[in-house]
Amino acid sequence: MKTRKILALLMAVLMLVGCLAACGGDGGSTTETQAASGSTGEAVVTESWTEEQIAQMGEAIKGEAGGSAVSLKIWGPELAQDVLKSQAEAFKALFADYADINLEVAVQGENDAAANIINDPKAAADVFGFPSDQLTKLNNANALAECYFPENVTADNTAASVAAASVDGKVMAYPETGDNSYILVYDKSLVSDEQAKSLEGVFEACEAAKKKFIMDSGNGFFTCMYLYTGGLVTEGFEEDGMTQKFNDYDINQVTASVKAFADLFTANKDYFESADTTAVADGFKNGTTAAGIAGSWNIAAVKEALGDNAGFAILPTININGTDTQIINMFGYKFIGVNSQSAYPITAQILAYYLTNEDCQMQRAEKLDWAPSNAAAQDSDFVKNNASMSALMAQTEFSIPQTALAGTFWDPLAALGTYMIEPTNDFSTEAVQAEVEACIAGIRDE
């Protein structure tokens, strides 16, 4: 991080708000802080920030506070509350010499974050987590404040995550994770690594063990694999900026892919279950499940349930008209955004930057199994030697970016996925093609 660039950015912001606080600082802050009581009790280090840089940020916060307390609300998912609270307390301690900072950490599902920010921005959180596909919606509603540290974010994170966080060349959010996707998880005592290479092999193992394979076919985030594997690709929006644009796909190939999944599910109806991804870890725990498709947010629970028998791999192949075809899925990122109507924009920006720095990303990797977007963190031995993170990173080669998706994208996919898991439905080529065409038309709102 370049000290001069931070200084220039913060001074420019301070001048804009009429605050002329000096950014020299008294050097009283340290590069390691202890989380306050009520959190996890573990230190959150900030080794990537020098004391001079912390002092500059502290003076900016002090100037914004103007002798009063700064109060901010943070939204994050339920699974991350303990870690988020610990990091929030560490942030307060880091800048305690400069201002009285009150941070409220509240549960807010990331999938609904954008809607709640847009519906009532003044009552919403100042800093919040959200998935990459919601960036366009938030930006179009002018709900996001542009990042104050674009050059630093670009230098710290992978190029792909920064590109996904940008609109028209402007960085609009702080990359938090580089793993918003899903992989195959399995019980290694029941499913061999070789069987895990193909969906047919996975079902073969499930049948032998008399146990389930679970995936959430009623969720468009997972259902999209049926279309993507057949060659359909999302390519942003049409000229109107709203209608989903697709590549020049072959409807026959897409239909063949969808039919292959439907036929395989039907043939293995006794061992296939469509359920929320939390059911995968629960199934491992109670001994009813041999394999499943789990989101990155469920990996820690899978590891807890299976221990040394936890297996992780990229999504398997599926046989389509005699050809083993790699399953293609959706891969996205999680971001932390700053509410454009925050009463304390400078402190909110520094907080968002802090929560996404290398050290905080590494703590989430260690505690939550969230793979980082930070390039240095990705290069750490911990991440490189982590089987689930390695599988998630490898899956990116076979994924479509979770960006620039229309608001109409999800419901038609969910309907298609629900249709496919009912064994009594008509899965003739003609019937499947009609469902595929209806799904695509629904996504395009035609």
Give residue ranges: language-model regions.
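Hinge/lid segment of periplasmic solute-binding proteins
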Residues: 38-64, 130-182, 194-204, 313-314
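Extracytoplasmic "Venus flytrap"/periplasmic binding protein-like
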Residues: 90, 94-157, 189-194, 290-291
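Extracytoplasmic/periplasmic solute-binding protein
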Residues: 170-176, 182, 201-247, 289
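Glycine-centered hinge/linker elements that transmit conformational signals in sensory
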Residues: 243-275
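Conserved C-terminal helix/tail region of periplasmic/extracytoplasmic solute-binding proteins
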Residues: 393-446
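Extracytoplasmic/periplasmic substrate-recognition and gating elements
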Residues: 93, 304-367
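A structural signal for short loop-to-beta-strand junctions that line the ligand-binding cleft
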Residues: 118-119, 123-126, 154-186, 211-215, ...
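Short, well-ordered beta-strand elements
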Residues: 43-47, 67-79, 99-106, 127, ...
